[in-house]
């Protein structure tokens, strides 16, 4: 993976800069490790001390399945309340990573609130989502089983990962999976539009075919 992280607003004249940009949004209760996951993905480092996030944005250029991708990642605060700013980035976001901590059952219950928030703003259940149970290295403090996470992911029809931001377990997989989900949805949309655009048989063609079959049966 390229470590080409660059600050917001910087310019880049390389051809890869013109590749597809994916707007990803991190959601989840406070303290579940959203910022640590993002920083591990962007810069391969784990922040030992980190102030609670208000809102941070990161950009990185990578390749996923041999296709270039410019990721624009928004790391949000840990509240599910509706605000005008949240409405704005929920509409602009193309895919969402909803995180909870396996050591905090309350954060797991709040996952549904964030999923409902996505629906409330976008009015569709078809938005690409990846569900993440973070802090998998703290097994002795586990409050949420892996089976519960898998069950909720099946309900959401989305990929699921248990991660460790501290040890960088499955961090890349989460972001790559979300980009794949976005690409899959885009391909499905293109196919649906192409199918809709195909010319249908005329009324006369549909009327003639039973007559033709009847005539053939008589002869």
Curated annotation (Swiss-Prot):
Further remark: Stimulation of the NGF and EGF receptor signaling pathways results in rapid and prolonged activation. Shows rapid uncatalyzed guanine nucleotide dissociation rates, which are very much 10-fold faster than those of most Ras subfamily members.
Keywords on record: Cell membrane, GTP-binding, Hydrolase, Membrane, Nucleotide-binding
Taxonomic lineage: Eukaryota, Metazoa, Chordata, Craniata, Vertebrata
Record SUPFAM superfamilies: P-loop containing nucleoside triphosphate hydrolases
Activity control summary: Alternates between an inactive form bound to GDP and an active form bound to GTP.
InterPro entries, alphabetized: P-loop_NTPase (IPR027417), Small_GTP-bd (IPR005225), Small_GTPase (IPR001806), Small_GTPase_Ras-type (IPR020849)
Family per record: Belongs to the small GTPase superfamily. Ras family.
The protein's name: GTP-binding protein Rit1
Organism listed in the record: Mus musculus (Mouse)
KW Cell membrane (keyword) present: yes
């Amino acid at each position: 993976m390229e470590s080409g992280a660059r600050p917001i607003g910087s310019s880049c004249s390389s051809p890869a800069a013109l590749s597809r940009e994916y707007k990803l949004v991190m959601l989840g209760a406070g303290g579940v490790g959203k910022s640590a996951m993002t920083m591990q993905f962007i810069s391969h480092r784990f922040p030992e001390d980190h102030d609670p996030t208000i809102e941070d944005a990161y950009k990185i250029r990578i390749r996923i399945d041999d296709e270039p991708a410019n990721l624009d990642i928004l790391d949000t605060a840990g509240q599910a309340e509706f605000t005008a700013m949240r409405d704005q980035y929920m509409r602009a976001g193309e895919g969402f990573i909803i995180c909870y901590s396996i050591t905090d059952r309350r954060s797991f219950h709040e996952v549904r609130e964030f999923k409902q928030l996505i629906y409330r703003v976008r009015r569709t259940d078809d938005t690409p989502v990846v569900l993440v149970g973070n802090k998998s290295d703290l097994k002795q403090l586990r409050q949420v089983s892996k089976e519960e996470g898998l069950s909720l992911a099946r309900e959401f029809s989305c990929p699921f990962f248990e991660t460790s931001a501290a040890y960088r377990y499955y961090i890349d997989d989460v972001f790559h999976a979300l980009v794949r989900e976005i690409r899959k949805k885009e391909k499905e949309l293109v196919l649906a539009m192409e199918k809709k655009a195909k010319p249908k048989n005329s009324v006369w063609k549909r009327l003639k075919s039973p007559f033709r079959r009847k005539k053939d049966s008589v002869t």
